Amino acid sequence: MDFFYLIGGAAVLLMTFLLHRFGNAWIDRLYASHRDILTFPLAVKERGRLRRFLLPLAFLLCGARAVYIASSPVELFFLLFAAAFLLLMTATDFEQYCLFDAMMLLFAAGGLFLSLIQLPRLSDHLLAAAIGGAAFLVLAILSRGALGGGDVKLIASLGLWLGRDALLFVTMAGIVLGGFAAFLLMLLRLKKRKSAFAYGPYFALTALALFMLRSV
């Protein structure tokens, strides 16, 4: 077990460095190639300043927790994989109110691969992705822009990782937390009622917290 902690800790440190170096660079490239969908295209540098330090720091903390709770190298891999992508997507949604398909597809592929490994859970996770995605598609249409296509894809992707019961918890908690944050911002007059608001981070961070509590 001490050897596992040693190797796991080394892997976390390596991935933290890679996320700092290449994760930030990936986000910058996505911003540069998708300027037409950015909410704040003229403030990319300003809004991304804190991310360059907070992203690796958050991953390092999640990685330390993952090493502690993981029972196998495979479990640790999926925990670190999920943490990295959830943090990357949280960063882009907070900064520019957008979630990129390139990140979403890789995250969804990781969830599908995990479901295939845990074969008895496969049908539940596929159902969660289908039902969650369909439900949020309807909500996105009814909300007239409050929820976007990125949120729909995020929920469907999370379904592949979580299954129905856990996805229901994450969506309910994310809606409550996002609603509270929006209300607080309006109360402080930092947002207006019709201002754009990112809900994706509240789903992503709730899922991440759940992974850090119970593993994948």
Task: Describe each PLM feature range.
Residues 1-216:
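A membrane-topology feature that recognizes alpha-helical transmembrane segments
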